[in-house]
């Protein structure tokens, strides 16, 4: 058989093949004997009880060790067995050989020569074994903690246990590249925990080591780490210098006499845009759109600029927003604060009778917002129309005219209730935003500002982060008319629309109804808007703006952070939506079928007016758009990222 031998192993005489180098001859078959079919057969007649009876006493092994220490020489196996046991034979030799293979420390077997370990080695090995016993005991205790699923104190764990805890944390975060050790896997089985992220998150929550609302995608990102002490110190330095004269301040147009207003959500603290109305000497109504100017303090390629570029945007979470710049700047000198002089970029627009742009311009300025309004306050003023708010009412009328103009250019206006989950005091709460007149006013003003800046970029061949959208083939007017207005019709349109794209050259934006568009009104929250302002500044000062290639390089860098922020924000909203449904798992809601997502799996999209949400749900066969359904929770587990909804007729 070449380098292998066929042998019969154990009392059961199981046939196996092993390399000859792994085999050691203990006793030769006596002359004239027939090879036995089992080790229990003659001439060996060995079994467990026989071997146990033949094994010398522990003190005999100890005495042999002392003698061999004095001799200082190794012995062949047969001589060593006779020294230990006082005799030799198949049974005692096999018993002693098996003892050598066990956990004993006194001797070592080197190619059939038995050596007594030196005393120093023996003491070291015994010390190591004692230490290992203690470590094993601590490890067993740690694995016992897992089975108990009770809160633990990580600082009391042994290093090996802490390493395993860190490994479990990594798995819970979705990073399961490093395999779980066998002992840990067995401990998880005892703890009734599958070796998968969701189950491990449940276990870690029980152990008090995992925030049930921690986002795996947020872990170890720039937002998770916050701003470094160096960046915070730089922010404090800029905060202290904000009131001092800066380059270009003398060239700013003073617009503080205009009655400007900012309109935002009640809890918004970083105000990056405002509105004003001016009646020119020619009697023309001029719209002013003021935009915060963080570039006055933040130099290109400075540490804060590089960090903002890395983030790409602010991060919007249910528990609160994480800003692109340190908070003391975004809510301080960057923000358009009411009653204070603020540096800004101001975009002015005069509309023609149809709502098109008749004249426009962009100017660095000083502005002083007269007051701040919430959307609710602004809606009330627009509805009540008090004479002292004539400017606000005129702005509303002008921007409604502009909105109708865009609609005539093919813009898709799809206003509807929008629900999202916010966290209040640790609880998931549903917040529904209604498309009121003030929200439409602000949105239209921001789109108008983006159109004006994009037009300026087009006329001067300026590289900007233009936003565009390819033309789409929409359902026919007859098909849309057959659908009820609102979410059902909107879903049919949205299905046809392409993704928004960013490029350094202008192109039409289909759903906005514009030939060119750029986002330019949130430089505190979007790095791309800050890039726009820097290009405008270079142009206004007669300097060369960034080339298309240089702009594209910056866009690519910031979009890494933007994509990450979008993914984190979506995961966050999905998680808190699951938490909300856990709190309302017995509820049911009227729903309207919108369209099929995966008909083969009976997965469709439904709209729940009461929640202001479009949700994926299991739907009955043959559902048609606008069909009324009732939505219920089938399964929800926020730690496992699971939500299954079922809609029934």
Predicted features and spans:
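Short, charged N-terminal helix-start/capping segments
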Residues: 2-13, 20, 30-31, 173-221, ...
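Charged low-complexity interaction tracts in eukaryotic proteins
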Residues: 97-98, 102-130, 214
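Low-complexity, highly charged intrinsically disordered N-terminal segments
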Residues: 151-253, 257
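Basic, amphipathic alpha-helix used for nucleic-acid engagement in HTH/winged-helix/SANT-Myb modules
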Residues: 35-58, 138-169
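Long, low-complexity, charged/polar intrinsically disordered regions in eukaryotic proteins
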Residues: 2-52, 109
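Electropositive polyanion-binding surfaces
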Residues: 3-5, 23-25, 46-105, 112-113, ...
């Amino acid at each position: 058989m070449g380098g292998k031998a066929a042998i019969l192993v154990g009392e059961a005489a199981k046939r196996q093949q092993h390399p000859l180098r792994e085999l050691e001859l203990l006793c030769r078959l006596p002359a004239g004997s027939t090879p036995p079919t089992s080790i229990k057969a003659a001439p060996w007649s060995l079994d467990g009880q026989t071997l146990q009876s033949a094994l010398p006493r522990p003190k005999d092994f100890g005495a042999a060790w002392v003698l061999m220490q004095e001799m200082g020489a190794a012995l062949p196996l047969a001589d060593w067995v006779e020294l230990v046991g006082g005799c030799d034979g198949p049974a005692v030799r096999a018993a002693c050989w098996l003892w050598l293979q066990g956990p004993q420390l006194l001797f070592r077997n080197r190619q059939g020569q038995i050596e007594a370990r030196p005393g120093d080695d023996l003491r070291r090995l015994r010390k190591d074994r004692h230490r290992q016993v203690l470590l094993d005991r601590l490890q067993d205790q740690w694995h016992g903690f897992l089975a108990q699923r009770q809160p633990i104190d990580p600082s009391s764990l042994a290093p090996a246990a802490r390493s395993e805890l860190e490994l479990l944390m990594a798995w819970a975060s979705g990073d399961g590249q490093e395999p779980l050790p066998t002992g840990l896997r067995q401990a998880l089985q005892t703890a009734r925990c599958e070796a998968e992220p969701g189950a491990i998150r449940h276990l870690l929550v029980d152990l008090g080591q995992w925030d049930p609302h921690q986002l795996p995608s947020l872990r170890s990102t720039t937002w998770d780490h916050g701003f470094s002490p160096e960046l915070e110190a730089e922010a404090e330095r800029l905060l202290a210098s904000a009131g001092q004269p800066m380059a270009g301040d003398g060239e700013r147009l003073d617009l503080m006499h205009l009655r400007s207003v900012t309109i935002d959500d009640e809890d918004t603290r970083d105000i990056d845009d405002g509105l004003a109305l001016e009646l020119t000497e020619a009697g023309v109504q001029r719209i002013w759109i003021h935009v915060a100017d963080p570039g006055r303090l933040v130099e290109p390629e400075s540490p804060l600029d590089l960090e903002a570029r890395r983030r790409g945007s602010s991060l919007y979470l249910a528990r609160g927003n994480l800003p692109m710049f340190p908070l003391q700047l975004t809510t301080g000198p960057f923000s358009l604060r009411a009653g204070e002089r603020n540096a800004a970029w101001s975009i002015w627009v005069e509309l023609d009778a149809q709502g098109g742009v008749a004249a426009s311009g962009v100017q660095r300025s000083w502005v002083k917002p007269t007051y701040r309004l919430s959307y609710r306050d602004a809606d009330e003023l627009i509805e009540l129309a008090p004479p002292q708010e004539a400017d606000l009412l005129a702005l509303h009328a002008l921007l409604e005219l502009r909105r109708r103009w865009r609609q005539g250019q093919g813009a898709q206006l799809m206003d509807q209730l929008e629900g999202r989950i916010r966290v209040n005091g640790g609880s998931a709460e549903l917040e529904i935003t209604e498309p009121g007149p003030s929200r439409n006013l602000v949105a239209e003003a921001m789109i108008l500002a983006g159109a004006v800046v994009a037009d300026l970029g087009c006329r001067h061949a300026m590289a900007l982060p233009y936003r565009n959208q390819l033309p789409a083939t929409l359902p026919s007017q007859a098909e849309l008319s057959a659908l009820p207005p609102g979410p059902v019709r909107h879903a049919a349109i949205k299905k046809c629309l392409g993704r928004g794209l960013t490029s350094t050259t202008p192109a039409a934006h289909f759903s906005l109804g514009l030939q060119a568009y750029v986002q330019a009104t949130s430089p505190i929250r979007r790095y791309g808007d800050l890039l726009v302002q820097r290009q405008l500044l270079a142009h206004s000062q007669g300097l060369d703006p960034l080339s298309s290639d240089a702009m594209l390089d910056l866009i690519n860098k910031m979009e890494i952070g933007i994509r990450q922020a979008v993914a984190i924000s979506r995961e966050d909203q999905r998680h808190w939506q699951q938490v909300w449904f856990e709190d309302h798992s017995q509820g049911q809601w009227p729903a309207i079928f919108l369209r099929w997502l995966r008909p083969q799996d009976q997965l469709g999209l439904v709209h729940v007016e009461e929640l202001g949400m479009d949700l994926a749900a299991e739907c009955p066969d043959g559902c048609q758009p606008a069909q009324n359904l009732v939505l219920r929770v089938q399964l929800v587990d926020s730690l496992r990222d699971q939500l299954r909804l079922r809609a029934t007729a």
